[in-house]
UniProtKB/Swiss-Prot annotation:
Location of the transit peptide in the chain: 1-63
Recorded metabolic or biological pathway in which this protein acts: Protein biosynthesis; polypeptide chain elongation
Upper classification of the organism: Eukaryota, Fungi, Dikarya, Ascomycota, Pezizomycotina
A Gene Ontology BP annotation from the UniProt entry: mitochondrial translational elongation
Annotated NCBIfam families: EF-G, PRK12740.1-5, small_GTP
Provenance organism: Sclerotinia sclerotiorum (strain ATCC 18683 / 1980 / Ss-1)
Keywords tagged on the record: Elongation factor, GTP-binding, Mitochondrion, Nucleotide-binding, Protein biosynthesis, Transit peptide
Name of this chain's protein: Elongation factor G, mitochondrial
Binding residues for GTP: 108-115, 183-187, 237-240
Classification via Gene3D superfamilies: 3.30.230.10, 3.30.70.240, Elongation Factor G (Translational Gtpase), domain 3, P-loop containing nucleotide triphosphate hydrolases, Translation factors
């Protein structure tokens, strides 16, 4: 094939990429402009992706200017290089290595059995020799809950990383898959741990309770998976519990999460008699034998009472696949039955393209049907080469560039989690492109500083295994790298950066100080460390009270850090009453014409600003951020002074006039003004704008906004009246109630201010059997009496400070 034909192939590259352009892809990029001589393998990959004959590009070095033009074209248009082309044209060794790698996370609602399932995965893959339960009698605790607090409370607080090898058996042959696994917390207060795990993973296992089905945090996790375009398989756990109803859970996935789903299995027995599953694809019964279910027994003998149900559920699976996969749709319309291979291939395609989630079922605690879930991870979740990852090329105005999971390309990685260890800061890195070697120099794209990698380790919960090198598509941890969570690292030759994770704003704050002054040093160390580790944990010093204020996602979130400070730094602290993150806004249009004029003998201050404030109408997602606009005509205020006006507006919005809280939903327009030849300055216009804002804001019928929390409460049915009574006292708005055979779930919007101390009252009202979770919903006007009290208290506190 001639080079001229390759060049012509570039012109048709749009067609080559058309199939993928309409699909959802994960946004992240590829080094296409490094020296051609150095990366001949890449040229082969690119050329084949653009329609060239594969054997032509097997040569190690291609120096042709036409080939370079092909590379430049692909760099300018990442869609020219499809994921199919990348997968098909990796060299044989790379393709084989990546084909057997899976980077997955386990995520779910609290108490759905994530950590218990992870413990079984580690046991069945040979990573641990014994199973320990989350709340086991031996008091050892699950392997992945390595923190003392996690084992005491029976919850996961930090995401924990590990790796294992799974020997998958297919048609009598064994094949080893390498799985990098992250177990995440289920509690909403630790949602950042789920965010940063999903940001760097290629797939996920979403665990649901067979009794409760889709719960509040399941919906949150689903939203996070969609944010990062993470394919998922679903595992319905706790099939041995009374009231287990897996097909109701499948229906809820379809209806509540709005993603097509179908069961790949039918349970053999139910509740206490749950004994195994029927594989609907191969129509085989699967049982677990051995003391811990470590032996898998398959048989063609399906229980007689299940044969009709299996036939119906298999037909439903094929019908659902026909809705999301063209190949199965054709077979279905021809009234033919797809083969096992066709069904598995369709499930894989639809899952990776985010069109479908296959549903499996089992009981981790009862050691049943966990191994088929591992097989499904290998069969249906993508390998690193099948996921489109993009970076931003700073040289090309942050245009997207594809990253390719190829060891021979220049290194690109993302630091997604920081952790303090006995050996210093531990930085978790996902390697997207190239390889990372011990002793290698890398560059931080944010700081532009060079860093040497002294040690590379693979993590197994709190244990580590040192390795000399880590390949593309893998996850590792490194020591001695000074960085922040979300930093991009490259080999120094690529001006790339990667988008970081979504970080929600804190909703609760409290003042904190060490009980004794001698603990001041350790107190500061703890604050600095916790901030580096957790982007949702914020610390600032109040300018007026000089108190240290910590902010976070909820009471439990802050309680955990206070307790960690005591245990890890031996610092006893005093905390103030929790403070709600209120906001301020106006409700009416109001004009202003304000002049700042000061004469003190020398050069004075002069600035006049004219304009108006108006409310921004609240949308479906609540109040919008405040905005500023200048509409000055005729040059009455110069550009540099208008910039100072905007700075004054932004400063005013940081600390509102009513309570000193940020301002939302307010639009300021400056449309006229005046300057003085000698007395006007940027500072004068900034101050004038702040004064005008404060005065106009108070005339615009201002309101205090309070955060409303979406609160989900689950408890036994007999306590429903007690809980409704508790919520009525708090003026909560109940939006949904779901009554199950044993428990009921209630969802309500509650004022955060009214929820302090709710956990102890809930325990008392339900004899300790109720549980609840909260996540921020939206801001709404606070009750009138509360607004008056808050404003009065703030004004009194301000007056007291001025007296001092």
């Amino acid at each position: 094939m001639s080079m001229h034909r390759v060049a012509r192939a570039v012109a048709s590259s749009e067609a080559c990429a058309g199939a993928l352009r309409g699909s959802v892809s994960r946004t992240r990029f590829l080094c296409l402009n490094a020296p051609v001589q150095r990366f001949g393998a890449r040229n082969a990959l690119l050329g084949a992706g653009l329609g060239a004959k594969r054997h032509f590009f097997q040569s190690p070095i291609i120096r042709s200017g036409v080939a370079q033009a092909v590379l430049e074209k692909a760099a300018a248009d990442p869609s020219a290089l499809t994921q199919e082309a990348i997968v098909d044209n990796l060299n044989a060794a790379e393709r084989d290595r990546l084909r057997r790698v899976r980077n997955i996370g386990i995520a779910a609602h609290i108490d759905s059995g994530k950590t218990t399932a992870t413990e079984r995965v580690l046991f069945y893959t040979g990573r641990i020799n014994a199973i320990h339960e989350v709340r086991g009698k031996d008091a050892v605790g699950a392997k992945m809950d390595s923190m003392e607090l996690e084992r005491e409370k029976g919850i996961t607080i930090q995401s924990a990383a590990t790796f294992c090898d799974w020997m998958k058996v297919e048609n009598g042959k064994e094949e080893k898959y390498h799985i990098n696994l992250i177990d995440t917390p289920g509690h909403i207060d630790f949602t950042i741990e789920v965010e940063r795990a999903l940001r760097v993973l290629d797939g996920a296992v979403m665990i649901l309770c067979a009794v409760s089905g889709v719960q509040s945090q399941t919906i949150t996790v689903d939203r996070q998976m969609r944010r990062y375009n993470v394919p998922r398989i679903s595992f319905i756990n706790k099939m041995d519990r009374m009231g287990a109803n897996p097909f109701k859970a499948v229906e809820q996935i379809n209806q509540k999460l709005r993603i097509p789903a179908a069961a790949l299995q039918v349970p053999i027995g139910s509740e206490d008699s749950f004994n195994g599953v029927v594989d609907l694809i191969r129509m085989k019964a699967i049982y677990n034998d051995g003391p811990k279910g470590e032996i898998i027994r398959e048989t063609d003998e399906i229980p007689e009472e299940l044969k009709q149900l299996c036939k119906e559920k298999r037909a439903l699976l094929i019908e659902t696949l026909a809705d999301v996969d063209d190949e199965i749709a054709e077979i279905f319309l021809d009234e033919k039955t797809p083969s096992i291979e066709q069904m598995k291939a369709a499930i894989r395609r639809a899952t990776i393209n985010l069109k479908f989630t296959p549903v499996l079922m089992g009981s981790a605690l009862a050691d049943k049907s966990v191994q088929p879930m591992l097989d499904a991870v290998c069969d249906y979740l993508p390998n690193p080469a099948e996921v489109e990852n993009l970076a931003l090329d700073k040289r090309r105005a942050e245009a997207p560039v594809k990253l390719v999971s190829y060891n021979e390309l220049p290194f690109v990685g993302l630091a997604f989690k920081l952790e303090e260890s006995n050996y210093g800061q531990l930085t978790y890195i996902r390697v997207y492109q190239g390889s990372l070697r011990k002793g290698m120099n890398v560059f931080n794209a944010r700081t532009d500083k060079r860093v040497k990698i002294p040690r590379i380790v693979r993590m197994h919960s709190n244990e580590m295994e040192e390795v000399p090198e880590i390949g593309a598509g893998e996850i590792c941890a490194v020591f001695g790298v000074d960085c922040a969570s979300g930093d991009t690292f490259t080999d120094g030759g690529l001006p790339y950066s990667m988008s970081s994770m979504f970080v929600p704003d804190p909703v609760i704050s409290l003042s904190i100080k060490p009980k004794t002054t001698k603990d001041g040093s350790n107190f500061s160390k703890a604050m600095n460390r916790f901030q580096r580790e957790d982007p949702t944990f914020r610390v600032h010093v109040d300018a007026e009270s000089q108190e240290t204020i910590i902010s976070g996602m909820g009471e439990l979130h802050l309680d955990i850090y206070v307790e960690r400070m005591r245990r890890e730094y031996k610092v006893e602290v005093e905390t103030g009453k929790p403070q709600v993150a209120y906001r301020e806004t106006i409700t009416e249009h109001v004009t202003f014409d304000h002049t700042l004029k000061k004469q003190t003998g020398g050069a004075g201050d002069y600035a006049r600003v004219v304009g108006f404030l108006e409310p921004i109408e609240a949308g479906p997602n609540g109040y919008a951020p405040s905005t500023f606009k200048e509409e000055v005509t005729g040059g009455s205020i110069s550009d540099k002074f208008l910039f100072a006006c905007e700075k004054g507006f932004l400063a005013s919005c940081e600390k509102g006039p009513l309570l000193g809280h940020p301002v939302l939903g307010t639009h300021m327009v400056v449309n006229d003004g005046a300057t003085h030849m000698t007395d006007s300055s940027e500072m004068a216009f900034k101050n004038a704008t702040q004064q005008a804002f404060r005065k106009a804001f108070k005339e615009g019928k201002p309101q205090v906004l309070e955060p409303l929390m979406k609160t989900t409460i689950t408890a036994p049915n007999e306590f429903q009246g007690n809980i409704v009574g508790l919520l009525n006292k708090r003026n909560a708005i109940i939006s949904d109630t779901e009554i199950g055979p044993e428990d009921f779930t209630l969802i309500a919007d509650c004022s955060l201010n009214a929820m302090f101390g709710f956990s102890s009252q809930l325990r008392a009202a339900t004899q300790g059997k109720g549980e609840f979770g909260m996540e921020f919903s939206h801001y709404a006007p606070a009750p009138g009496q509360l607004q008056k009290e808050l404003i009065s208290n703030y004004e009194k506190a301000q007056a007291d400070r001025h007296k001092k």
